[in-house]
Swiss-Prot record:
Organism per entry: Kluyveromyces lactis (strain ATCC 8585 / CBS 2359 / DSM 70799 / NBRC 1267 / NRRL Y-1140 / WM37) (Yeast)
Protein name (record): Protein HIR2
One GO-annotated biological process of the protein: DNA-templated transcription
Keyword tags: Chromatin regulator, Nucleus, Repeat, Repressor, Transcription, Transcription regulation, WD repeat
A GO cellular-component term linked to this record: nucleus
Taxonomic classification: Eukaryota, Fungi, Dikarya, Ascomycota, Saccharomycotina
InterPro entries (alphabetical): HIR1-like (IPR031120), HIRA-like_C (IPR011494), WD40/YVTN_repeat-like_dom_sf (IPR015943), WD40_repeat_dom_sf (IPR036322)
WD repeats: 10-46, 113-153, 155-194, 259-305, 309-348, 508-548, 558-597
Amino acid sequence: MKLLKLPSKLHDGQLTQCEVDDNKLYIIGGKYLSIWDSQTLLNAATGKTDVKEVKELEKMSLDLLESNQEDGRWLVVLDNQRLVYGSDHLLACLDLNKDSNSEYKSREIGIFKDNEAITDLKYDKVNGLLFVSLSKANSLQIMDSKTWELKSSIELKSKPISIITDPLGQLLTVILQNRSVQIYQYDSHGTTKLHQSINQFVQTNPLPYRMTMSPQGDVIPMINSLHNNVPTAVLLDRIQKFKIKLSLVGYVADCKILKFSPRIYSKTKSPTSNDTQTFNLLASSGNEDGNVVVWNTNRIKPLFDASKVVNSYITDLEWDNSGLGLFAISQDGQLVIFAFQENELGDVMPVEAVTEAAKEIKLLDPLPFKPKAEEPDTKLPPNKTAQQTTTNSKKQPKAAEITTISSTNMEFIQPSYMVPKDLKRKPVTEDPLLAQNKPANKKAKKELDQIDFLDTNLFLPSVSFSKVRLAHPKIRASFQYSSQGNFVLDIKNGLGNDQKPTSITLTRKDNESSKQLFQTFLPKFVTLCSAGSSFWAWSTDTGMIYVTSISGQMLFPPMLLGVPVSFLEGSGDYLLCITSIGQMYCWNVNTGKIAFPINDVYSLLNPMLRYSDDVLSRAENITMCAVTSQGIPIVTLSNGDGYMFDSAMEAWMLINDSWWPYGSQYWNFMSSAGVDLTSNDDEKKDKYWNAEADILAKEVKNNKNSIINYLETKTNDELTRKGRMKHLQRFAKVLLMKEGFENLEEMITLAHLENKILVSFRLKEVEEAIRLLKIYCIRIAEMGYTDRFSQTLSWLYDPTNTKFSPLDIDRRRNLIKDIIISCANIRQVQRVTTSYANELGVISDSL
């Protein structure tokens, strides 16, 4: 695939709609219309033509738009070199057949009032009809494209948003603002009949959707439904009474464009088989993200995804007639060309294949022709439940209701309000014309207000009310995970079904050979995997976790979490999992139990800083998630902070604060990746410098297995990446010179050391905690903090004190002796050290 973005902006940086007809690309935007040769654009994208030679065939100024001071929004290409364009209140026809010396002339078709706006414009080439939807009147007008005569008009219940025409010339799909979808049958005379109605199907949006049916006419696309709590687009099967044929999972929530390629594609199922499968391709784009996604109707996952093609949002997409090109226009005037190679999307079948596929669809019975003289003269009031056109007397089947997304909030399936036959109370008729034949002597009962109910089917409260949305991995074709140096778990994803399952293989690789330990298959997509000391685990895209031994034997039945997994980490006997809604699980695989009750990461994301009643907002990213061999979860954020979860307190605790690097003299035990943040030895020797404390600090620095050191390195990396490190170091120096902040550096240093000591004990890194405790005691003794020094020794001396519970009595006594000897020459604490030395016999032993 080749992508070309024209360097110059078109139409003064404003493009709204494009159409391809007879190898020509028509683009309207602003007050201009330009015509391009589509093959020349594709050749320029593939490198066959120099981009500098690419120019439009024609560019014309639309006089009617200039005179009415409006911008072009709508464009359809008719037969015989004619096209219809329009704005919000204007509709005009442009004849492209002209002499070489004459100019293009526009003919005005209709002008609408200021409060009457055109919401969509479509053309049916089979019957030569033009469909215009109007907002104020809530109507849809059907016009003859040759005489511009108004054939008929359909009165709608709500404002029409978008129109989808049928390539077979029989069905007209209208999307209304009340989230319902009306499907009408029509003919060349303009006669219409309501064919089917689907309630609460799409989200309400004032902007029109740009959608097309499949070229053979068997599928209608619908945007922004919900599938397993993931925004999707669904394809409705015309043959199966518009039931869902396929859901495109992983779809962007704000999509506004979904267009089918005009060709059908085929692909051989396997190299050894001659069987082929046919499929269609769809191109879609969101309203703000600037992405372009291509779908294969035989797959539920995207076939191709181009991110941030343009800086603004894409206003329209259009396929080339060859099926190998795709054009995209943006709101800021950019034209983007996607040129696909042959066989890249599949084998493009000839045009006749579309005709043959269309013949397999059973057409509807023709509508009875009703002359105008027989039509009723009385026009029904708008916005009523009665239809102006002919309706089917048979009861229509209830359409399937599909949950959709109207914003970033979660919505629920609304209950049905259809009245059963055995209910005597009937809804009050609003239209007096329909009630004129009914008895009026019976007093109508008061109409009760409708009650909204929550649907209990497929209802997960943790998802519906969760304010946390974490990203989860995309599905990869294959990936590997290494553990313990020589074990490699190889994941090869299939199609996610039993026809081609996912392969999972564990191999032990030595220097010269490799041995397969086990292999298994799953009819699902695998997204993450991890390993511990005696187990392997992997998760699927549906939130199911499998745990096996090294030999491949299942240790537990598959665990279903209900939502995708964002993090899956193992260490020792523990397996940590964080789901996409922020729930955290930690299991002890050896005992087969959960290590602590289920918790979440919601509190780490500073929810109160970005709190909103009904809007989800961005928070700090989780840059790392891990679990220690002792079963302690550790999380780092993009702001540099690191946290651990304490199972005894059942709360998250701060390991390192991004504030401490700016003032703590003991922060830079390890340098950031690629940036040395430490100073030289002379700068370290301040008035509180101590040789023994310096030696202990170097021992802590050289401990490569220290969890705290690693997390401090992560903090340094984040601060350096954001460019805040040098700036805040200068800021700290300026702050120290201000009145009232003279001891700021001392307080930050002590806070940092105290936290490191407490965290080391909770992480069960006892040796590192002892070294840090010695450094801390020497530091506070030199600073003259006698109370803190005395309290620390009293905690160590008291065997019932649980602050340093990992230390037994003998280690506590020996640690006190080491501290007393290290601080013996510090005059400020000699009274404290002497009392403890006498109690422990240090003085008598030395004498």
